[in-house]
Amino acid sequence: MKMIGIAFLCAGALLAQDGGEKATVPLTDPSRPAHIRVHLIQGGITVRGANIKNVVVEARERPDGESRESRPAAAAGMKRLDLPNNAGLDVVEEDNVVNIKTASWNQPSDLVITVPQRSSLQLKCLNNGDIYVENVDGEIDADDLNGKVTLKNVSGSVVAHSLNGAVHVSLDQVDPSKPMSFSTLNGDIDVTLPDTVKANVRMKTDNGEIYSDFDVKLDAGGPSSLSASGRRPDGSYHLHFDRSLHGTINGGGPEFQFTSYNGQIYIHKK
């Protein structure tokens, strides 16, 4: 196992740069795809695929921006001694799996990560940042609580979710054996798929419209179909009608789900 951690001492493949940090992480077996896992409490994640054999991680903590009004009364007339403006980057690599996190809980830290093009990603942001990915071929799982998710020119399979942000995905190629999911509570979903894609689609928005470039063959059940029924333990009989649309693209395939509560759904043909 290789571990690279950032503190006030620098070693090997780790550099401190003007309030930021940069680490070059060798993979155990560069001939195999990498698996990148990132979890940020505060900040955004950018991942770019490239023709490289290692993983390069750059972290930068955003400026504090303290105002005079935020100083304690007891500090009047005193000079503030700033703590090092670094994100506390921590990177661990084991058997081509790279786990990345920062020690910054209160101050947002933005990560820019360059990976081999054939990589799988698990990305999670909670606050004060967006997720952006481009030119990556693999399984991508992107989850942003309070920001938008953008995946550009990616291939493979995607699970993309945002609670309070838009989801924009452009796929060059899809894995024909994998299901996919695109969802948001408050935001639009905009997905571009290859024109030859085969999929069973399930689409639902409570407060929006659904638009598609594809000729979606809708199931005969119509816009509202019975999804659950039966007698409950208290003796009452329950019927539930699902408001989602079900259909197929190009004859059907793995299931693709598109779900928004407050937003439009756009399905484009590449």
Model-predicted segments: where are they?
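Solenoidal tandem-repeat scaffolds enriched in leucines and small polar residues
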Residues: 151-152, 160-163, 169-170
